A protein has these predicted regions:
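Short intrinsically disordered, low-complexity coil segments enriched in acidic
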Residues: 1-2, 70, 139
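Short secondary-structure capping micro-motifs at structural edges
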Residues: 19, 83-84
Length: 184
């Protein structure tokens, strides 16, 4: 299976030093789309996460993702969320993300909670942002998810910067990229 995932995260609302340097960015939402071996969408996953480190949302984060503190308070703790997500992924899967930051922050959050054993590393993944550049541009540039969506003239039915929406856009872009491009 292909698991295309996206994360949203928060940071210190004061914008100054991090209260806990081990977790500069705290994951607050996981969204994912699952494709089968025929590259057909077979399932989705979405989970809000109740913050433990940064209880208030940084202003710039709030402007972008449009989630408020009260919504996050209804979320579940990260350890439960990551277990649900990995269970949803199943036994055999390949991760796909837009860029490399989500994988890095996922591992950092799992390390913070002492949960790296749930996903033995190194974590292998495909960077759809890079694949987009290889297939449609110069192989070097890194474009925004919205740019790629517009470039491919894909319909924009949801707001960007929500985890499930961004995972869905990334999955639709991936479907425009042939498997041969992934082998390169």
């Amino acid at each position: 299976d292909y698991v295309i995932f996206d994360l949203e995260w928060n940071q210190n609302p004061d914008g100054r030093r991090h209260p806990d340097s081990r977790l500069p960015f705290e994951i607050i939402e996981i969204g994912a789309v699952k494709l089968n071996e025929k590259r057909e969408i077979v399932d989705t996953f979405q989970c809000l996460i109740k913050p433990k480190v940064y209880h208030w949302i940084h202003d710039s984060i709030h402007e972008v993702i449009h989630v408020d503190y009260h919504e996050l308070e209804k979320g579940i703790p990260f350890p439960r969320a990551i277990r649900r997500f990995l269970e949803w992924c199943g036994e055999e899967y390949r991760f796909f993300t837009w860029g490399d930051q989500d994988v890095m922050e996922l591992q950092r959050n799992m390390k913070y909670y002492n949960l790296l054993k749930l996903m033995p590393g190194p974590v292998h993944y495909y960077d759809v942002q890079k694949l987009f550049s290889i297939k449609f541009e110069d192989g070097i540039s890194r474009r925004s998810l919205e740019y790629a969506t517009d470039y491919l003239q894909l319909p924009k039915s949801r707001d960007f910067h929500r985890a499930l929406a961004d995972a869905s856009y990334t999955a639709r872009i991936l479907l425009e990229i042939d498997e041969a491009c992934m082998i390169r």
